[in-house]
Amino acid sequence: MAEILGLGVTHWPTLCQPNEGLTGVFKTTLRAPNVEAARKDPASWPPELLAELGNDDGLSAAHRCGERFGNDFRAIRKILDDFNPDVVVVWGDDQYENFREDIVPAFCLLGYDPDFEIKPWHNGNGGKPNRWSEPADWALRLHGHREAAKFLATGLIERGIDMAYAYQPLHHPMAHAFTNTFLYLDWDRKGFPYPVIPFAVNCYGRNLLHAKGGLAHLFQPPRPADEAEDPPSPPPWRCMQVGAAVAQVLAASPYRAALIASSSWSRTRSMAPKLLCPSTWPGIRRSERR
């Protein structure tokens, strides 16, 4: 009998790294040529940020952050274990990992093999230390659910959603939005036994191919003025339609399904109103209304 559990998690900041590395993105941003010099000046930073940096370059705050997130993910994992799903559908963005010049769908669900593995420290971590002190050849073992993926894709297409799907990766084993989600949900490394269906979304839209994902947009020159923009990401109303259709399909399925929305929490919330990246202001406005 169909049952649905909804959960929300973050797949960023860089919780994969030891606490000493949690300020890495912030420091990278300060070196970026596309960030205004005035915003790199500590004199312009709010007191909350300066307090977190403290006199140890943010290490104490990073330890508190790591402990909090670890406990939060343990709590979410317990909810998931108590529900004991037949399948776990995870929404996340693809940042030029498999959505590249050869194909950029708005959405794509992944019906991977019943047993597959990913080597997160070999594929994308660049040899950096990780929080769990795992070697480069350590493998995250996961399970796909192709039958459920086919059921979901079929139901979406029948409801007017032109759903792309794939049974194997095209360029990268798995987008970090999904890899990090599964790493964090298995914080204590007891294994992740539930079959998964990653559901990739083109959140980068017009900037995906030019920026090539990640933080590259902070370093690359702007698009030439005479070059036409790439198509946008799916609009919010379409995302709502897709989400509603997913709920309808799974409600009519034989599966106990956990639906997990995986995103990144704002890295600029405490920077308002002096933002390193002004385009993040709408996200802060939304946060203030919650």
Each language-model region and where it sits:
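Active-site histidine-anchored catalytic micro-motif
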Residues: 3-290
